[in-house]
C-alpha cells in the first residue's frame, strides 16, 4: 500500500490542477463539512485524501454510523441541521423513503453514470455498487470439512450459530443480502421464506454490518453475509484466512449514493464533495487509492490494473427486481421480523 501512496497522491494532485471545479458556480470552497457515513475507515481515508488534494481548505468531520442511525439523527436535527452530506447506506431500493430528509438535488455527473445507475429518486447521487458476497474463514471451514459456495451450503447443520448477518431493519448491507436471496428464490415466495426460515436456524443477527466480515476474520464466525467492498479489504490488508465468495446461485448489486441534508449549513462544500465523488476523475483517483476494492458508477472511470475485486465478467449475476423490492420492503421486513422472533426468540 505504502509503495503506491506517493503515486496516488501525485495523481490526486494532477486532478487538482487539471480538472474543472466541482463546486456550484465554480465558487471557491473552504471551511468545515460534516459527513454522516456508514463507509469503512479506508473508504473515508481515500475520499478525504483525494478530495482534499482538490479542495485543501475544506475540513471534513466524519460522523460514522449505520444508515438507520444517521437518518434518525438527521430527522431529529431537522429544525437545526448539523450534518451536510451522507455517504454510504442510501441505496436504490429505498425509493422515496427518505425524501423529507434531503435536498432535491443531484450531481452534475448524474448523466455519466452507467446505465441503470443514475439517480433513482432525484435526491440520491449514486457513486458505488455493493455486491452481495460471503466472507468465509477458510481455516474454520477446513476444520469443519466444508466447502461453502452456495446458499444451500449455508444450511449445513455444522454451521449452526456460525453464520452472521446484520439487522436489515437498520443495516443497508443486510437488506442488500436479503434482496439477493429474494432475487434467487423469488420475492416473498413460499420458497424464499422457507429458505430464510432454515437459514435463521444457523444464523446470528447483529447490529453493525462491519461485524459480518471483521468477526469472521477474528474467528468468531465461519461465514458472514456481507458486501464485497468491506470484506475484500481484509485480504488487501494481508488476511490469508478469509475469502470473498459469491453465491453460485448468483449475486447482484445495490447501487449506493450520497445525498445532501436538507437546509445543511455548508451547502457549497457538500455539493463539491458529491460532484467530486461521482465524477470520472474523482472515481479514478479513489479507485487508484483503494487498489480497486470498490465498484464505482461513472461510466468513464478507470479501473486500476491489478484490482482486488473479481471482474464482473467472471461472475454469475442474477437479475434484481428493484421496483418490486421497493414496493414490498415494509411487508418483507415485517415478515422477516416475525420469523426472527419465532425462530431466535
Where would I find each of the regions flagged by the language model?
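Extracytoplasmic ligand-binding site segments that recognize negatively charged/polar headgroups
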Residues: 34-45, 65-68, 82-220
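Hydrophobic residues within well-ordered alpha-helices
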Residues: 74, 215-219, 260
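Mature extracytoplasmic/periplasmic domains
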Residues: 252, 256, 261-320
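Periplasmic-binding protein-like
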Residues: 112, 130, 195-199, 205-206, ...
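A ligand-binding cleft/hinge motif common to bilobed small-molecule-binding domains
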Residues: 92-97, 217, 222-241
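Conserved N-terminal structural module of periplasmic/extracytoplasmic solute-binding proteins
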Residues: 24-85
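Conserved C-terminal helix/tail region of periplasmic/extracytoplasmic solute-binding proteins
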Residues: 316-345
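Short, low-complexity disordered leader/linker segments with a strong preference
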Residues: 1-32, 344-345
Amino acid at each position: 500500500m505504502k509503495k503506491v501512496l506517493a503515486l496516488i497522491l501525485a495523481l490526486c494532485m494532477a486532478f487538482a490542477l487539471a480538472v474543472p471545479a466541482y463546486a456550484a458556480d465554480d465558487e471557491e470552497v473552504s471551511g468545515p463539512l460534516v459527513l454522516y457515513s456508514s463507509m469503512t475507515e479506508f473508504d473515508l481515508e481515500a475520499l478525504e485524501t483525494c478530495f482534499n488534494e482538490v479542495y485543501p481548505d475544506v475540513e471534513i468531520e466524519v460522523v460514522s454510523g449505520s444508515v438507520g442511525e444517521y437518518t434518525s439523527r438527521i430527522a431529529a436535527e431537522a429544525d437545526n441541521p448539523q450534518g451536510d452530506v451522507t455517504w454510504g447506506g442510501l441505496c436504490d431500493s429505498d425509493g422515496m423513503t427518505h425524501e423529507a430528509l434531503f435536498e432535491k438535488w443531484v450531481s452534475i455527473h448524474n448523466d455519466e453514470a452507467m446505465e441503470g445507475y443514475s439517480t433513482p429518486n432525484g435526491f440520491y447521487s449514486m457513486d458505488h455498487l455493493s455486491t452481495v458476497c460471503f466472507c468465509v474463514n477458510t481455516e474454520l471451514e477446513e476444520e469443519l470439512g466444508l466447502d461453502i459456495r452456495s446458499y444451500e451450503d449455508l444450511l449445513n447443520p455444522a454451521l449452526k450459530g456460525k453464520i452472521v448477518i446484520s439487522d436489515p431493519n437498520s443495516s443497508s448491507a443486510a437488506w442488500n443480502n436479503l434482496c439477493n436471496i429474494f432475487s434467487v428464490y423469488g420475492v416473498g415466495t413460499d420458497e424464499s421464506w422457507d429458505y430464510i426460515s432454515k437459514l435463521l436456524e444457523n444464523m446470528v443477527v447483529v447490529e453493525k454490518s462491519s461485524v459480518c466480515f471483521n468477526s469472521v476474520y477474528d474467528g468468531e464466525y465461519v461465514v458472514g453475509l456481507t458486501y464485497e467492498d468491506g470484506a475484500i479489504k481484509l485480504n488487501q490488508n494481508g488476511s490469508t484466512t478469509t475469502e470473498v465468495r459469491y453465491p453460485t446461485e448468483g449475486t447482484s448489486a445495490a447501487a449506493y449514493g450520497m445525498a445532501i441534508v436538507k437546509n445543511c449549513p455548508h451547502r457549497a462544500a457538500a455539493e463539491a464533495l458529491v460532484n467530486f465523488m461521482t465524477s470520472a476523475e474523482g472515481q479514478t483517483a479513489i479507485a487508484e487509492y483503494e487498489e480497486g476494492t470498490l465498484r464505482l458508477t461513472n461510466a468513464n472511470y478507470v479501473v486500476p490494473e491489478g484490482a482486488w475485486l473479481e471482474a464482473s465478467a467472471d461472475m454469475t449475476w442474477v437479475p434484481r427486481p428493484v421496483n418490486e423490492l421497493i414496493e414490498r420492503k415494509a411487508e418483507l421486513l415485517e415478515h422477516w421480523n416475525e420469523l426472527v422472533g419465532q425462530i431466535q426468540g
